Amino acid sequence: MRVGVHKIRMNNPGDVSELQRLIEAGEVKPDEIVALIGKTEGNGGANDFTRGFATQSFSLLLAGYLGISPEAVTQRIPFVWSGGTEGVLSPHATIFTRSEAEPTGEKRLSIGIAITREFAPEEVGTMTEVREVAEAVRAAFFDAAIDNAADVHYVQVKGPLLTPAAVADAGRRGAKLVTTDPNGSKPYARGATALGVAVALGEVDEALLSDEVIARRMDFYSSVANTSAGGELRNCEIILFGNSSRAGGNLRIGHGILKDVVDTDGVKAAIADALGTKADQTAVDVSAVKAVFAKAEAPVGGVLRGARTTMLSDADINYERHARAALGAVITSVTGDPRIFVSGGTEHQCKPGEAPIAVIVEI
């Protein structure tokens, strides 16, 4: 296996011209595309339709090349979009390809894909979703040809939140939901999928979990999960990244933990982890960085390093947007590239106030 990473600019959520150019130039083969992760310029909330628009645009393009329907494209390729390009964050997409290659003798970047069944509204944010995601993560782990959970550095999950239509459907059927607030369902949805990752990788014992734990007991978490929820999906899409001795190529992945949204040293440490170096963090070679994926979170109680912030009390701007803008600037100050995947909300993704970060580098 050889994984290719192609990061492209987007002028709007429907702009597929860069991918089309790569395909026409022979730099990307459509039948080798296995996943896409990107940022769109929506608000990231329950009424963010830029994500669905972007998926529709890319699936229409690829349908023409692959000779299948757009619907078949989305069943074959996970399209994971995070809405919200606040501050310096730039709308973009990272396309992942997978092809045959001889192992190098060293562990190299590997990718595994899995997609769950569709969920009923009453299953979102519950143990049912936890278990289904855990099973899918195990399948993605196998697909990535990784032998040890310690070699997994990043598990991206995108799943459904409760849209107004889903809430109404459950109401007609008398089904109980975790909440009837569409935006309020995001913590439950993100939390359940993150716990699914934690269970699959042995970070949390499933026997300790219950519906009452989700989005409440934050002492249960995964250190490598990066989960998002949107109204454009009814199932969960899992993209698992790690390093495998059965993979070829010249890419590696590493990860780290950001202590807060201004943790520059944490960014550098994640880059160093990917490079496999123990050098002084100030000497990290950022020119090797191919892609960065991180979560952003407001500080616990709104207090950042002893100083009060308004992230959690601002009635006009959601805290996730504050956090994405802050972390986007911090990471860009290190790498020099604002095309970063930064997603808000870290329920069961590292300890409260902390956040995961993963980096792919060329070696």
PLM feature spans:
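Terminal domain-initiation and capping elements
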Residues: 1-363
